[in-house]
C-alpha cells in the first residue's frame, strides 16, 4: 500500500463512509479510509433482530462503559459504539428519525445560520429513497427508508396504537413530518427484511473505484503534525506501527468518543491534562474530551398476560429455528424487524412548543443491556428526553 494519498479519513462510521463516497467521486482525488474494525458484511448485521448480538460482540463493538455516575448509584453504564464499517449504523435499532424543525431553527437563532431546518432539508431529501408520498421526503437517495408496517403484522403493536388513541394522543402517519406529535410506527432503515447500513448505501455501489482504498482492522493512534498542520497519521496494523501521509487533508471522523481521544493523543486538548500523560502539546484547546452529552433512556417494564411477546423467540430453540429459516430463506418473519419500530413524541408540559420526550415500544424485556434473557412474557416502553441538559 502506498504511504501517500490526497485525503485520509479516520473512521468509517456514517460520516466517514459518506465522505469517502463524495471525495472519491472526483477521479483526481485519491482517498484512503481507515477503519479500526472489520467489514460489516455478515448476517448478524443484515438481520434486523440480531442487533443485540452485534452490540455485545467485541469484534464489532468498542464496548465502552461510562465513568461511575454519582446520581445513578455510582453505576457504570454500557455505551456501545460501532467498531466496523458503518459504525453505529451497522448495529443500531434502524429507526430513522430526523431532528425536529424547531430544534434546527433554534440552532440557527444561536448563530448557526447553515443549520436551520430549511438549510438541512435538502440534504435529508438527498440521502433517502422513501417509500411514501410527501414532498418533504427524498425519492432517489442512496439510503432506503420505509415506513414500518409492524403494527399490521403483530397484535401487540396494534394494541399500543389503540391505547394511545384512547388516551387522546394523535396517531401520526409520517414520523418525520413537520407535525409528528403523538404515536405511530417509525420510519426504518430496513428494506425487504434487511438492514440498510450506511456502507450498503454509500460504499457498496463504489467499491470498485480505483481512487478509493478502504483499510480495515487498522487502529489510528494519532495525527502527525508539521508546523501545526495535519500531514498524516500514525497507525497500528498487525501489532506494527506505520505512518501514512496526506497531500491535501486529514479528516477526523471517528465518532464522539474516539475523535477527541485521537485529538488528545495527537497533542490537542487541555494542556494540563495532556502533560500528565507526557503528550507533547500541539494546541492547548480546553474542552476536547469534555462535555459529552447523550440521551438517557429509562425502561418501563410490564409483565404480559398474553404470549404475544418475543419471550418464546428468545428462549425456544424450535421457534428460533423456524424464524431463522424464514429469514435466511425469504428475509421475512419476526427476524426481519428490529421490533423498536413503534413509539411516539409527546410534550410533558402543554406550554412547550414541541415534544420533549420520545417513547419506543419493545415487545420483550431488555435486562442488563440485553446480556440476560427474560424469564417470562413481558414488554417495555423506553422513555427518553429529547433535549437533555446534563453534560459529562
What does each of the following model-derived ranges do?
Residues 50-51, 63, 183-191, 215-229, ...:
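A glycine-rich dinucleotide-binding beta-alpha-beta segment and adjacent secondary-structure elements
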Residues 301-392:
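FAD cofactor-binding and catalytic pocket of flavoenzymes
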Residues 1-126, 285, 295-304:
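N-terminal glycine-rich phosphate/pyrophosphate-binding loop and immediately adjacent elements
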Residues 17-21, 200, 260, 264:
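Short, hydrophobic alpha-helix immediately C-terminal to the catalytic nucleophile
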Residues 30, 37-42, 223-226, 232-322:
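Glycine-rich loop(s) and the adjacent beta-strand/alpha-helix scaffold that form part
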Residues 108-230, 236, 299-322:
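Conserved redox-cofactor binding core of oxidoreductases
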